[in-house]
Every structure is written in structure tokens, then in C-alpha cells.
Amino acid sequence: FWLDLGADGFRVDKALKLVKDDDEGRPANIRLRQDFRAFLEREYPHCAMVSEWGVPKESIAGGFHMDFMLHFGPPAYTSLFRGERPFFAKEGEGDITAFLDTFSAMLASTDGKGLICIPSGNHDMPRLARGRDMRDLKICFAFLLTMPGAPFLYYGDEIGMRYLAGIPSVEGGYFRTGSRSPMQWERRTGFGFTSSATSYIPFDKSADAPTVSEQRADADSLW
């Protein structure tokens, strides 16, 4: 259905959890995903499969083109931007060793087979801009956009949209709701996302909330 409408592929949530009680290495899950990949190659060869799996040697063996590094499990990804003492923080107290060890092993196990994705964030964690200014974010993006693999930008991160702490939980989002506010396209009612002055998840009410239109006009902006 979605592919016939023009979608370019699927980002599969919890891709490693489809088969319950699978054996170590998830062989049953891998076989099932291989069947789906074979269907795509036959019917929609232009489409891509991206997995929320976190073990690229398994997910790519299962037919996915790309796999995300995740914010749960080993602390490799969280040690970069989040966690108690992230590497990309002004204080300079972080340690990148765990990330490098994990990423190097992932890269070696998938060389020539598929891509590892380091996301700027997602809907389940505080935004990258939390606790950082635009200079900090430029350094983060210089890293993300030059590492091997395929970088993924969570919507709004490209303009430094802020994490909105303390807003009401929506749809069981709890603290995660603060990373799910509407995209801020331009400085007018509804930020160009809607013509309404209110939205299901609140807007950033800050006077200096970043917008796409303003950043595109500024040669020194994060955009």
C-alpha cells in the first residue's frame, strides 16, 4: 500500500522483536526479514529497509540495508551526546572509548554489506539541543555528517529545535513528549505547521524559537 503510494522504504520499529523466544543471534527473525527483503527486491527494488535493531551484523544479515545505533543496550551511542557525561559536552569530561570500540566492531562486521546509522536523536529521547548552544550543535553535526555510514537527522534537529521539558504527556509520551513538538517552519501562528494557535502537542513558546525560514536566511546558522 505505502510503497505503491510512493514511499521509499520502511524504518522498522523494534525490528529485532518480531519473533518471540528466538535463539541467540535471532536466526528466526533473520529468516523472516530475509523473506521480506526478497519481496522488496522483486517488486520494489528501489526501496530501502532501515532497522531499529542495534546489532548491524544481525539486522543486515536479515536483509536490512541500514541499522541504527540505539540509545538502549550498550552505552556506546549515549556516551556521545547524552548520558551523565557525554563526550560532546562543554565540560570535556566524556570518554569516547566505548563508542569507538563498539562502532569499530560494527563497521568491521558489516563492511561492504550495509550501513550503520548514527541518528541525531529520535522521538524517545531528549533532543540533541538540550544543554547545548548553536556552536555546540555545529560540532555535533560535523561529527555526525562525516562518520562512515548514513547519518539520520531527527526532524527539527537541523535547526536546533529545543527539548520542551515539563509539557503535558501526550499518548503515553511522558518525558519523551518534549521531543515531539511540531516542526517550526516559519515565525507566524502555528509556525507554518498549522494555522491554529494551539496544537495537540504544544509549540515552543520561546521568543527565539528557531525556525527553518530564519535559519535558511542566515549564512551562519546551523542550517
Predicted features, each with a name:
Residues 26:
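Metal-dependent catalytic neighborhoods of phosphoester/phosphodiester hydrolases
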Residues 1-22, 30-149, 206-207:
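Alpha-amylase-like alpha-glycosidases and glucanotransferases acting on alpha-linked glucans and related
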Residues 41-43, 63, 71, 98-101, ...:
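Loop/helix patches that line or flank the sugar-binding groove of alpha-linked glycan CAZymes
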